[in-house]
Amino acid sequence: MTSSRDALSIAQALLRCPSVTPADAGALGVLETLLKDAGFTAHRVTFSEPGAADIDNLYARIGDGAPHLCFAGHTDVVPPGDADAWSHGAFSGDVEGGLLYGRGAVDMKGGIACAVAAVLDHLAAHGGRPKGSISFLITGDEEDVAVNGTVKLLQWAADRGETFDHCIVGEPSNVEAIGDTIKIGRRGSQSGMLIVDGLQGHVAYPHRASNPIPDIAALITALNDEPLDQGSAQFQPSNLEFTSVDVGNPATNVIPAQARAKFNIRFNDHHTQDSLKALIEQRLAAACGNRIRARIEWLPSNADVFVTKPGNFTDLVTASIADVTGRTPDLNTGGGTSDARFIAKYCPVVEFGLVGQTMHQIDERTPVADLDQLTAIYRGVLERYFKS
């Protein structure tokens, strides 16, 4: 059986586990069995948090020396949506026309399957042991609140004395074809609620009331008028987006007492969460003057900005991609947040996996040929990494 076929069979086994967060549905067990059979020491660790579901996680390692390369990812998936809209069952793992179908095919059970297949191939070619250490850090809590997953598993590993030299997260990083993009960082994310207080009253007597709606509209305009920055060497400009405006007023003859607007900021490495909040508060105060009564309620966030500077590790991954695909990948920091933000606090990390065009969609799918290529790229990474 070829390694690409191994990746396919592993992916199918994972896809047939309906592991919608927080359910595991046997997905971690599939990986644990494969890795234990290959000589890994595996640990299943369950974390709890008040108000959140308990989540099972997997950490497996082979080898006890440096360098230590970690593959990280998640086996949980988003809900499939309308089951009847799928041309193949969302958890069928069916292959038709060279395409593998299933929720998680690209995000990111397919990527995990390729990493496992590549590692098994590498070990088979090198006497069953790496010239260093290889680990898998896999959570079932990435697609939801992400409080009982990677962030706690990393701390658990650190408390045991585990250290990582580099990490690859198998998120679907590519835009159109395998090898076109490596994610070397992510913007931070901070959400908040802008609240403007007015004075409720009858619309026929506006002089006896204070309407917060024109005021919140003016503040939204003011906060959007001036850019937060011009971007940096690795990041696009930071961006503030208002996502809703609400007054909770069902009446047409009552001026509301309060208006609220939700917003999110995706910010680059010019800012920290604290400095960003201070900047927005300063601009809000200037826009309010002495007339408008407004404040911001900031929502909790664990999504800090991070970047892995291009260097030997990104060069190694780039060379492995070029060998298999002939492409030179773009190193970028676009897109949303991922668990790589937690890993970046422990070691340099990049994200490289399948093509993300169908992730979270009905009929999520990946070409089987892409599984072949990604497995070959990961094999190349392993060969270079443990020779360097």
UniProtKB/Swiss-Prot annotation:
Keywords: Amino-acid biosynthesis, Cobalt, Diaminopimelate biosynthesis, Hydrolase, Lysine biosynthesis, Metal-binding, Zinc. Pathway: Amino-acid biosynthesis; L-lysine biosynthesis via DAP pathway; LL-2,6-diaminopimelate from (S)-tetrahydrodipicolinate (succinylase route): step 3/3. The keyword Transmembrane helix does not apply. InterPro entries: Bact_exopeptidase_dim_dom, DapE_proteobac, Peptidase_M20, Peptidase_M20_dimer, Peptidase_M20A. GO terms for biological process: diaminopimelate biosynthetic process; L-arginine biosynthetic process; lysine biosynthetic process via diaminopimelate. It comes from the Bacteria. It is an enzyme of class 3 (hydrolase). Pfam families: M20_dimer, Peptidase_M20. It catalyses: N-succinyl-(2S,6S)-2,6-diaminopimelate + H2O = (2S,6S)-2,6-diaminopimelate + succinate. The keyword Magnesium does not apply. Homodimer. This is Succinyl-diaminopimelate desuccinylase.
